[in-house]
Protein backbone atom coordinates (compact mmCIF):
# COMPACT_ATOMS: atom_id res chain seq x y z
CA UNK A 1 0.00 0.00 0.00
CA UNK A 2 1.06 3.56 -0.60
CA UNK A 3 -0.28 6.74 0.94
CA UNK A 4 -0.12 9.95 -1.06
CA UNK A 5 1.51 12.85 0.71
CA UNK A 6 -0.32 16.01 1.62
CA UNK A 7 0.39 19.13 -0.41
CA UNK A 8 3.71 20.48 0.82
CA UNK A 9 4.74 23.62 -1.08
CA UNK A 10 8.31 24.47 -1.98
CA UNK A 11 9.88 27.34 -0.08
CA UNK A 12 10.63 30.66 -1.77
CA UNK A 13 14.31 29.69 -1.63
CA UNK A 14 13.58 26.46 -3.49
CA UNK A 15 11.61 28.33 -6.16
CA UNK A 16 14.47 30.81 -6.54
CA UNK A 17 16.88 27.86 -6.89
CA UNK A 18 14.74 26.40 -9.71
CA UNK A 19 14.77 29.76 -11.47
CA UNK A 20 18.55 29.98 -11.17
CA UNK A 21 18.85 26.45 -12.61
CA UNK A 22 16.71 27.46 -15.59
CA UNK A 23 18.84 30.56 -16.12
CA UNK A 24 22.03 28.45 -16.15
CA UNK A 25 20.81 25.59 -18.35
CA UNK A 26 19.77 27.41 -21.55
CA UNK A 27 22.69 27.45 -23.99
CA UNK A 28 21.41 28.87 -27.28
CA UNK A 29 18.38 29.32 -29.50
CA UNK A 30 17.46 28.60 -33.10
CA UNK A 31 14.97 30.46 -35.25
CA UNK A 32 13.14 29.22 -38.33
CA UNK A 33 12.94 31.29 -41.49
CA UNK A 34 11.35 29.42 -44.39
CA UNK A 35 12.47 25.79 -44.03
CA UNK A 36 15.85 26.59 -42.45
CA UNK A 37 16.80 26.71 -38.77
CA UNK A 38 19.58 29.12 -37.80
CA UNK A 39 21.48 29.08 -34.50
CA UNK A 40 21.53 32.32 -32.51
CA UNK A 41 23.07 33.13 -29.11
CA UNK A 42 21.07 33.93 -26.00
CA UNK A 43 21.21 37.69 -25.39
CA UNK A 44 20.48 37.44 -21.64
CA UNK A 45 18.43 35.51 -19.08
CA UNK A 46 16.97 37.14 -15.98
CA UNK A 47 14.25 36.96 -13.36
CA UNK A 48 11.60 39.64 -13.89
CA UNK A 49 10.09 41.69 -11.05
CA UNK A 50 6.93 39.52 -11.15
CA UNK A 51 8.99 36.33 -10.64
CA UNK A 52 8.89 34.99 -14.20
CA UNK A 53 12.13 33.85 -15.83
CA UNK A 54 12.80 35.66 -19.11
CA UNK A 55 15.08 34.43 -21.90
CA UNK A 56 16.03 37.16 -24.39
CA UNK A 57 17.20 36.68 -27.98
CA UNK A 58 18.26 39.58 -30.22
CA UNK A 59 17.23 39.42 -33.86
CA UNK A 60 19.49 42.06 -35.38
CA UNK A 61 19.71 43.50 -38.90
CA UNK A 62 21.24 40.22 -40.21
CA UNK A 63 18.18 38.15 -39.26
CA UNK A 64 15.53 37.52 -41.94
CA UNK A 65 12.34 39.58 -41.93
CA UNK A 66 9.95 36.66 -41.34
CA UNK A 67 10.68 34.38 -38.37
CA UNK A 68 8.22 31.49 -38.04
CA UNK A 69 9.64 29.40 -35.19
CA UNK A 70 11.96 29.48 -32.22
CA UNK A 71 13.68 26.74 -30.21
CA UNK A 72 15.79 26.86 -27.06
CA UNK A 73 18.45 24.28 -26.24
CA UNK A 74 19.79 22.95 -22.95
CA UNK A 75 23.55 23.17 -22.40
CA UNK A 76 23.65 19.35 -22.69
CA UNK A 77 22.41 19.62 -26.28
CA UNK A 78 18.77 18.56 -26.09
CA UNK A 79 15.78 20.62 -27.21
CA UNK A 80 14.48 22.40 -24.13
CA UNK A 81 11.51 24.43 -25.44
CA UNK A 82 10.22 25.49 -28.82
CA UNK A 83 7.31 26.20 -31.05
CA UNK A 84 5.83 28.26 -33.83
CA UNK A 85 6.24 32.02 -33.82
CA UNK A 86 5.13 34.84 -36.06
CA UNK A 87 7.65 37.69 -36.03
CA UNK A 88 7.82 40.24 -38.79
CA UNK A 89 11.07 42.16 -38.44
CA UNK A 90 9.99 44.67 -41.12
CA UNK A 91 7.82 46.30 -38.43
CA UNK A 92 10.95 47.25 -36.46
CA UNK A 93 13.72 49.54 -37.72
CA UNK A 94 16.85 48.12 -36.07
CA UNK A 95 15.86 44.66 -34.88
CA UNK A 96 13.82 42.80 -32.28
CA UNK A 97 14.73 41.93 -28.69
CA UNK A 98 12.54 38.82 -28.30
CA UNK A 99 11.49 37.75 -24.79
CA UNK A 100 10.33 34.24 -23.90
CA UNK A 101 8.95 33.99 -20.35
CA UNK A 102 8.35 31.11 -17.97
CA UNK A 103 6.18 31.25 -14.88
CA UNK A 104 6.74 28.57 -12.24
CA UNK A 105 3.44 27.63 -10.58
CA UNK A 106 2.97 25.18 -7.73
CA UNK A 107 0.02 22.84 -7.39
CA UNK A 108 -0.76 19.79 -5.29
CA UNK A 109 -0.29 17.42 -8.22
CA UNK A 110 -3.50 15.60 -7.30
CA UNK A 111 -5.94 15.19 -10.16
Model-derived segments and spans:
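Small cysteine-rich, disulfide-bonded extracellular modules of the LU/uPAR three-finger superfamily
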Residues: 1-69, 75-111
